[in-house]
Regions:
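N-terminal accessory regions of nucleic-acid-interacting proteins
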Residues: 1-52, 58, 90, 120, ...
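Conserved DEDDh/DEDDy metal-dependent 3′-5′ exonuclease domain
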Residues: 16, 21, 25, 53, ...
């Protein structure tokens, strides 16, 4: 557990790493509660059915055979400057607010390789994670009307939307590695640099997804995000 202020190219992102169902539930409630100056904008968005964009990522360690184990960490980034890292291995139960949040059809969860990552499952003490996800490359390809983007990696997509992104120096089948070696995703406590690595992809996916959706509605396109997502 812990709170961290992470700097991404001059943007300060507040990250919380949590293993308490109560604290996770509070984080979700706080993020969905509009500030007074945002209330009018939120009402307009709901009336127009513009989805809330959330960057999502999952991390898993390797077992003794070298295969990916069940996901140990769930990462969510939203509201410009907030990320949550849920320690699935240690939380007693996944709170109802988080389950409801993940299944909310007004929320568009964007990321890379999400079908595969979700297929790794969660620790057996928890119910499977169910959420409506959109593969970021497919979202960008559809909005930009450029099919070739479907094969683009996160670095290329970030360049398209001018979002700063520097991939980890090393990686693995279960998630990115830190610059000083692989991260133990089952650790109780993480170094600040490790936390930055853990949330980097989810945060960049959020930024790109948000810009994509804003462009979609700015151009008054009638496509619905639901048509390219899944439940």
């Amino acid at each position: 557990m812990g709170k961290y202020d992470i700097n991404f190219e001059g943007e300060l992102v507040k990250v919380e790493v949590l293993d308490s169902a109560e604290l996770i539930s509070s984080w979700i409630i706080d993020r969905l509660k509009p500030k007074p100056q945002e209330e009018a904008a939120v009402v307009v968005r709901l009336q127009e059915e513009e989805p809330v964009v959330v960057g999502l990522d999952l991390h898993a360690s390797k077992n003794k055979r070298g295969d990916c184990s069940a996901n140990s960490l769930l990462v969510l980034c939203m509201n410009d400057a907030y990320c949550l890292v849920v320690q699935l291995k240690y939380v007693d139960n996944i709170p109802g607010n988080l389950k409801k949040f993940l299944s909310d059809r007004r929320i568009c969860f964007v990321g890379v390789g999400l079908d595969w990552k979700l297929s790794r499952g969660v620790p057996p003490s928890h119910d499977p994670l169910v959420c409506r996800t959109v593969e970021l490359s497919h979202l960008v390809a559809r909005i930009c009307k450029e099919p070739s983007y479907c094969n683009s990696d996160l670095k290329a997509l970030a360049a398209t939307y001018e979002v700063p992104y520097e991939p980890p120096a090393s990686g693995g089948c279960c998630g990115g590695g830190g610059r000083r070696g692989r991260i133990n995703y089952e650790a109780r406590v993480f170094l600040k640099e490790e936390v930055k690595t853990l949330v980097r992809d989810a945060y960049v996916c959020y930024k790109i997804g948000q810009k994509s959706v804003e462009a979609l509605y700015r151009d008054e396109t009638t496509q619905e995000i639901a048509g390219i997502g899944r439940q």
